[in-house]
Amino acid sequence: MKPEVFYKTLADQGIQLTDQQKHQFHRYFQLLVEWNEKINLTAITEESEVYLKHFYDSIAPLLQGHIQNEPLRLLDIGAGAGFPSLPMKIIFPQLDVTIIDSLNKRINFLHLLAEELELEGVHFYHGRAEDFAQDKNFRAQFDLVTARAVARMQILSELTIPYLKLHGKLIALKASSAEDELTQAKNALNLLFAKVIENHDYTLPNGDPRTLTIVEKKKETPNKFPRKAGMPNKRPL
């Protein structure tokens, strides 16, 4: 997907990018490739692949109408090089985006990226999702949490649901169908007082399969969740 095709595909779906937004995506691509030689950010570095499999893939929740250009607080867990939240932030600048990542080198990249792209209302923190979720400045403070190919729902739900406000939503992007995952996650979702409200498969323009799952927080999360760092992975709920 060449940049021009990316712009046209968005325009066809009602999103007209400004010259500034086009420049932001172009600079994002350049910095991603440049920094990828120093630290491992992505295996995808060819321009048309980055525009398709990182930029276009990341904005599926926008294209499908799940996120609007409103001053919502969005947390991205394990965003790596900023996906999916920063492409969404470029298109919908009103979003207030927070990223937590366990690797400090990636956080350094994100700080530089945000400065270069002149993004405002973005916040980056180095650490584990399990730890920040017990901090009152983070717990139950977000309207939305996004996660792209981070972990199975059984694990992901414990890492993310505590951050949501009541009736806030987790938006999980996956590369394959999530049906089996959701069956395995039933117990975790029950314990966390959360419910799957949408789950559907779709394809990228090149035919690659994708799944988008939305989980809503129905009641306050019990204080014991999430458990200590490493436990959700070691012993899923």
UniProtKB/Swiss-Prot annotation:
Q: Where in the cell is it found?
A: Cytoplasm
- Specify the superkingdom: Bacteria
Q: Which GO terms describe its cellular component?
A: cytosol
The free-text function statement in the UniProt record for this protein reads: Specifically methylates the N7 position of a guanine in 16S rRNA.
Q: According to the UniProt entry, what is the EC number of this protein? A: 2.1.1.-
Q: Where does S-adenosyl-L-methionine bind?
A: 78, 83, 129-130, 148
Q: In which broad location class does this protein mainly occur, judging by the first location in its UniProt entry?
A: cytoplasm
| GO molecular function list | rRNA (guanine-N7-)-methyltransferase activity
Q: What is this protein called?
A: Ribosomal RNA small subunit methyltransferase G
Q: Which family does it belong to?
A: Belongs to the methyltransferase superfamily. RNA methyltransferase RsmG family.
